[in-house]
Amino acid sequence: GLWQKIKDKASELVSGIVEGVK
């Protein structure tokens, strides 16, 4: 559902931030 899409987007954002910090 919608919540799953939001969680997926949040995970993508977190992964992007983590990669940027490395």
UniProtKB/Swiss-Prot annotation:
Keyword Secreted (UniProt): yes
Secreted among keywords: yes
Subcellular location per the Swiss-Prot or TrEMBL entry: Secreted
Domain of life: Eukaryota
An annotated GO cellular component: extracellular region
UniProt keyword terms in alphabetical order: Amidation, Amphibian defense peptide, Antibiotic, Antimicrobial, Secreted
Tissue-wise expression: Expressed by the skin dorsal glands.
Annotated positions of the Lysine amide modification: K22
One biological process term in Gene Ontology: defense response to Gram-negative bacterium
Function: Antibacterial peptide with narrow spectrum of activity. Inhibits the formation of NO by neuronal nitric oxide synthase.
Similarity comment: Belongs to the frog skin active peptide (FSAP) family. Caerin subfamily.
Protein name per its UniProtKB record: Caerin-3.1
Species per Swiss-Prot/TrEMBL record: Litoria rothii (Roth's tree frog)
